[in-house]
């Protein structure tokens, strides 16, 4: 994993704009903006496809979800990059739907009967969670210390493990084929495996930028092969409109139910940790000073985007890490490039015919790509846990009990069947149940007793390699998954020091370092490597997918 230079941010005179604030010529804005869209696209569309398929939506309804998602992604990215009042970090951050919300939204939607009726309950929870995020943004910095590596690593592992079954289900043919002879057909498995192998080959042999598009290229290649063999149906594309606008509350007024709201607020808490890490990471890459106000503005943008998502028939939003890596690789730091990318996404969100093409991707092809992306989320979580002292019984119990809680809904489907119907929205989501368990156990073991878990030095995990060796997110971090987020120190605070280490002006203490005596010395320094980590999962080495 490449390390970002650890120099003091360069000072710019009043006449010299910081590169982040530089307005490039239209041709360059167009080129670099489209580059961001390519790196982002696969991760942007896969969430509405997976959620829509799981809830049993029709092709037309799926197209609407995809277009609404892209439209909201564009608006959210523009708000984050340009800034409106105290909303938006004014940094080159691209916004996308977080993978963290996938499993809870499916559980909420199915618990409400599936279909568009289930979506109404999902949207009520999304809107409320967005409002909570917006209001809570200025105070979140004080809570980051309650998300130490043992919690972050456990949550990311849970996210990956609970999402992988969704990918496997699509690989076998999709939820609609369960109980039919076509489910698990060897041909379906061959398409899924072929797509997965294609992605792996692109990452292995492709140049950095090409590798950043591995998931997108895998989806295109797998769909093309399926079409040539007569297994992809694009008949609905010709009937789709060329132009269409997503309207607020398209499926009706949202329904606000307590336990779905609790589940979605938990999702947004995890997402806020991720966004905090993303903001410090992009500040490090661009040499732009980041402070608590910047983080609060970014979190408000997440909240505002999530509210918009619920109103315009989409989902919760957070920054996409693979685009941060793209900024590092291209050296183009202008936030107006992200504004251009947002414009492209808005245009794509107004083209139902383009959305219809995406909705026609065969389930097995989608499943092959999803396995890679979701598996990487779990891998990143395991990577973080590898730096936690699991010989310490408390840490081991946090991991063990949280994993057991998260696996209950999938491993034993009727486990909570006799619980009150309203509370099942929380209990039937492995991500929500497991994450709550991890946070509460950490409070019980390590906070109320004034003990803290060790901190992580990301350089120890990834190795210290030359920056030039990598593209978007480092050669060892496939994208497709929302990255692990963590408490990132502020710009310039690259390596929080151990209490027993000599103080150095080059490594000041960051305000987000967990407090209290540590059971083992170490450093939690994600952005010291130059690769943003966050709980949407790791947006992966060079793959275009996502997470956060």
Label every PLM stretch briefly:
Residues 64, 87-101, 145-152, 210-217, ...:
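Short, non-helical or kinked segments that cap or interrupt transmembrane helices
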Residues 108-232, 342-454:
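Membrane-embedded alpha-helical modules
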């Amino acid at each position: 994993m490449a390390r970002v230079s650890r120099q003091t941010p360069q000072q710019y005179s009043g006449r010299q704009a910081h590169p982040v604030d530089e307005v490039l010529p239209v041709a360059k804005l167009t080129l670099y903006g489209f580059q961001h869209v390519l790196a982002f696209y696969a991760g942007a569309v896969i969430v509405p496809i997976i959620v829509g398929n799981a809830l049993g939506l029709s092709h037309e309804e799926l197209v609407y979800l995809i277009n609404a998602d892209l439209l909201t992604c564009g608006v959210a990215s523009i708000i984050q990059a340009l800034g409106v009042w105290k909303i938006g970090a004014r940094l080159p951050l691209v916004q996308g739907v977080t993978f963290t919300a996938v499993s809870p939204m499916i559980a909420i939607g199915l618990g409400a009967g599936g279909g568009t009726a289930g979506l109404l309950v999902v949207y009520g929870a999304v809107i409320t969670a967005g409002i909570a995020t917006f209001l809570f943004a200025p105070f979140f910095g004080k809570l980051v210390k309650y998300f130490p590596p043992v919690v972050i690593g456990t949550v990311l592992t849970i996210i990956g493990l609970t999402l992988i079954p969704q990918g496997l289900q699509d690989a076998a043919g999709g939820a609609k084929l369960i109980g039919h002879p076509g489910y698990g057909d060897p041909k379906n498995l061959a398409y899924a495996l072929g797509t997965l192998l294609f992605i792996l080959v692109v990452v292995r042999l492709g140049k950095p930028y090409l590798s950043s598009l591995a998931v997108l290229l895998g989806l295109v290649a797998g769909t093309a092969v399926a079409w040539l063999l007569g297994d992809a149906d694009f008949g609905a594309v010709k009937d789709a409109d060329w132009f269409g606008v997503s309207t607020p509350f398209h499926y009706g007024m949202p329904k606000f139910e307590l336990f779905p709201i609790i589940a979605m607020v938990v999702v947004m808490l995890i997402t806020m940790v991720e966004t905090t890490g993303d903001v410090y990471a992009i500040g490090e890459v661009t040499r732009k000073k980041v402070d608590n106000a910047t983080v609060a503005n970014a979190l408000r943008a997440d909240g505002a985007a999530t509210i918009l998502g619920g109103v315009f028939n989409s989902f919760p939003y957070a920054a996409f890490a693979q685009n941060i890596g793209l900024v590092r690789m291209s050296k183009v730091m202008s936030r107006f490039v992200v504004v251009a990318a947002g414009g492209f996404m808005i245009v794509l969100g107004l083209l139902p015919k383009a959305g219809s093409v995406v909705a026609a991707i065969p389930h097995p092809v989608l499943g092959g790509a999803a396995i890679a992306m979701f598996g990487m989320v779990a891998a990143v979580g395991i990577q973080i846990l590898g730096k936690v002292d699991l010989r310490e019984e408390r840490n081991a119990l946090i991991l063990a009990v949280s994993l057991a809680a998260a696996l209950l809904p999938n491993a034993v489907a009727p486990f909570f069947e006799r619980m009150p119907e309203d509370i099942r929205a929380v209990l039937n989501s492995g991500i929500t149940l497991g994450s709550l368990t991890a946070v509460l156990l950490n409070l019980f073991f390590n906070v109320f007793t004034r003990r803290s878990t060790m901190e992580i030095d990301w350089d120890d995990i990834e190795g210290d390699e030359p920056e030039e060796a990598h593209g978007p997110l480092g050669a060892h971090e496939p994208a497709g998954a929302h990255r692990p987020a963590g408490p990132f120190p502020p710009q310039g605070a690259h390596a929080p020091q151990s209490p027993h280490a000599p103080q150095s002006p080059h490594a000041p203490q960051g305000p987000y370092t967990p407090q209290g005596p540590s059971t083992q010395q170490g450093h939690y320094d994600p952005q010291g490597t130059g690769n943003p980590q966050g709980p949407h999962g790791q947006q992966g080495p060079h793959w275009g997918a996502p997470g956060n």
